[in-house]
């Protein structure tokens, strides 16, 4: 293994030390990080194997707001400055790439004018395997994004997205379907 890989693994191990002894955080093997990872809150955060949380500019923030909340990051996922906030559940599948986006399973306020001062209802967010989410994307509560999908920069996702498409815009809409042969990383493990 080249010395740079050894140094990156050592740095990843050292920078995740504050989380290695917390009961509510599970760090998968070979997690890469560079000190730009912040995990806070009383809920559970789980990383799969070979997750890369190596952000060059922005901090990766994983925040749980309730003890029963869960954030799961699948194997081989890459996080680059994303913010994930869970009151119930946010799942990111295997082989996903997340830019400086925001995923929330709840809003800090209710949509109803009558209940505006109360927190919104939590609805799970699920990102299936091999999804690429660009920068400045907002994924709102209750959304499921199908596998092998690309979400373009600055998109705001209100509704479920089918598998194998490229979406963009505000609100996000399907721009085109991806070729079935081009999708899927299909790493073996």
Language-model-derived ranges and their functions:
Residues 109, 114-115, 143, 177-178:
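Conserved catalytic-core motifs of eukaryotic protein kinase domains, centered on the activation segment
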Residues 1-105, 125-129, 137, 147, ...:
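Domain-scale signature associated with acetyltransferase and cell-envelope carbohydrate enzymes
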Residues 144-166:
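C-terminal/domain-terminus segments
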Residues 116-128:
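Glycine-rich NAD(P)-binding loop of Rossmann-like domains
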